[in-house]
């Protein structure tokens, strides 16, 4: 809108400038004041007088000619045909188009502000109504689809031969007719026996496809308990009953296979889940313990550096300071004064501190590992309880649903088989025995899950290995400090021997 305002302002400025140039070109700039009395008695402005009324033969023209004689007549004749007059006309027309566009844009904006919220509400309502409209569409279309589903395989004549597919398009029908006409023209001289053989082959191929598709559809519909959607793919009711009986047997075997596989995999699934959780927890705990061991090594190295500096100052020299009246101790070079005289007790306290720190770390580490083992045992037990709960829910649902299907099989079997047939009675009894046997296996497997010993081998092996590694590290640290202690003892003995010799030398002099 700012750009439109700037453009309109510039156009108005151009219009006024052009208007002024027109007046200056034609010498009418000084006549504006003289024409004011005429404008008072007419409805025209000065500009409109020049635009439309200063023409030959008008009343205004006669008045001006009479007042100003012939001086204005050339201007009156020249002004309407001026080039600037045409430019001004173009400017007026352009300005009118812009004004009309702005008015139209304002109208569109007002309509949008009023209709926009309403359309938005309608769009939201349509979005929430879409699932219901889809359901209505499915309800209306399903009966028609179920009743016409068989028609996609073709229509049949009275003698049972295939004529043509019902849902064939017009283009396919025309192509089929053209092919028939061409075949008739080309095969006029062929024997009728060959034609009969080809027709029989076509019927045989179609029957094979039809039977295979019918079998799969029958089995699917029987398993889904939707017998209304069974596609009749045979010519006899006996074959349909055979398909349904086979589908019931297939469903029975499918139930047995599904439940039996779950029973055999329940224990393995529990152990696998526990092991995967243990691996993740061990990895996190290993990172924590590695960080603690790094801190221990850093502390031990700092103590070793401090201990080495003290051991180095055991071979010190002493000088008497008469000013302070005391003995001062310097390092072996005699240049650096020592803060304190190195004694066995100071070295012993350093070694004692390192032993206490190492012992505290060992206790903390072992306590952390024991807590981790207890925590992992509780975690494994919670996983076991969760798996048992899931298994119980699965067992209840599967056994209850399977028992319902078994009852349905018995009811349907009475219509499909001879209920007094010994083979049918024996098979039905065998099915129920297998059902009860599998049900007992489901219950026994649940009890096995509850009493199953949780495999903590991964955690125990990791803790054992970690303790062994720490023991090796501890032994290395102790060996290092033991070497430093032996070195300090040797230096203390040498220093004591040296001090004894000095004392004897002093006594001999005195």
UniProtKB/Swiss-Prot annotation:
Superkingdom of the organism of origin: Eukaryota
Modified residues (Phosphotyrosine): 354
Record keywords: Phosphoprotein, Signal, Sporulation
Mutant lacking the gene: phenotype: A combined deletion of the OSW7 and SHE10 has reduced dityrosine incorporation in the outer spore wall.
An annotated GO BP: ascospore wall assembly
Region span, Disordered: 167-195
Function in brief: Involved in spore wall assembly.
Family the UniProt entry places it in: Belongs to the OSW/SHE family.
Protein name: Outer spore wall protein 7
Upper lineage: Eukaryota, Fungi, Dikarya, Ascomycota, Saccharomycotina
